[in-house]
């Protein structure tokens, strides 16, 4: 649930209702909060495309259609673009030109219930991290090995989770990732006006829904459980959706990770900033031994 949507909800009677339910019926409050947690926001900030439309493709997932686009030579190494919660594949199309111009192939897709893809098992306007991770795995299976994956926001969580389920990638780029969803439930509780009685029940409902502990999606802890290719983290210090400290925590935990920080780009404009695009493209293109890796947690 993005901070922008939480801000809108804060102004409504929903907050007063959650406060009452915390006292008299926390289980009902948790059910309401769960419904909000899995709801996809309306797309924000759609702009003109920076890249010409690619060649369309479709893959089947859960008996439904996931759509995407491909740019570049079919025989080239492939870079996958993964959008975040409420996003869409072409949201990351600023990376297409530099990468295809350097001889790489680029694949983007709309996750279930996002963009032009069919709704997933959760139904229209709803999704889970698992659906994003499964969509990435299905798209890679259909389009070939991943030279690199560039993922934004919650898409980074999905990409990291996919690594733990067998996805192989030569390099990873996480732009404005969330380090751990569990602390975010406390932020949601504070903004929506409910306390620990409701929040603990909300966490239990989320875990039952996805079939995994929320700790399974904590990126710093994943470093000890998954294959960790070289990782570039990019995060703005003024991001109000996911904090810069999230990327710093991931960088301290993942081997062969470095953090590139920006100022004033926020959570979405960072995807189109020329300096960020150049930094990411340079990382994706550099030979594995071309640049010495600094200790995890240092910044470029």
Language model segments and positions:
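An N-terminal hydrophobic leader/cap segment in hydrolases
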Residues: 2-60
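Hydrolase active-site cap/lid region
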Residues: 167-212
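Catalytic histidine-centered segment of alpha/beta-hydrolase-like enzymes
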Residues: 265-275, 293, 297
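Conserved alpha/beta-hydrolase
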Residues: 89, 96-120
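Alpha/beta-hydrolase active-site loop
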Residues: 124-147
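Conserved alpha/beta-hydrolase "acid-adjacent" motif
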Residues: 240-246
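Post-His helix in hydrolase/transferase enzymes
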Residues: 271-286
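Short beta-strand/loop motif that positions the catalytic acidic residue
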Residues: 226-227, 232-235, 239
